[in-house]
Amino acid sequence: MRNSSKTMVLCSLFAALIAICAWISIPVGDISFTLQTLGIFLSLGLLGGKRGCAAIAIYLLLGAAGMPVFSGFRGGLGMLIGVTGGFLWGFLLCGLTYWALERFGKLPAMIAGQLICYLCGCIWFYLYADGGLWVILLRCVVPFLIPDAAKLYLAYILTRRLSRHIT
């Protein structure tokens, strides 16, 4: 398979993986707990920053076009501009952060990407919700810290074990 064909197939498959991970969802207030970030970090860790960002962009474009790829089998532009849209945009910024920092190691790049995703999501959520910084952090970050750390570490471990089989 030609390299460009292989890249297109891998990016598309990982965009699908992110969607499947998004469908595994448990509502927690305004924000659902999903395995989306596991899919994001597997994409970045296994494909690298550039191709991982492409997979994330494909995922977001499919959702924007109305495909039900987001949590709760939802899609459409409304999801990208809704109350949790900042987290969706944060996935792309997370990918770009990973891409910029991957030369320092996968785990530090993943952690930095997760922090950027939180930042983007919290700023966006603040524009929609009442309350100050602490209220936003209690709603958008605190309940997700431990599960997100576990997903990030699982993605890191899987990336280390599977990398030689993907690229």
Language-model features, listed with the residues they occupy:
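Short helix-perturbing small/polar motifs within transmembrane alpha-helices
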Residues: 9-15, 20, 77-119
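Membrane-helix interface "capping/anchor" motifs
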Residues: 44-56, 101-108
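Membrane-embedded alpha-helical hairpins and interfacial helices in multi-pass inner-membrane proteins
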Residues: 73, 103-167
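Hydrophobic transmembrane alpha-helices
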Residues: 1-53, 94-99, 159-163
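Interfacial aromatic-anchored transmembrane helix boundaries in multi-pass membrane proteins
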Residues: 22-35, 60-94
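Structural signal for membrane-spanning alpha-helices in multi-pass inner-membrane proteins
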Residues: 18, 22, 44, 63, ...
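Residue-level recognition of membrane-helix boundary sites in multi-pass small-molecule transporters
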Residues: 50-51, 85, 135
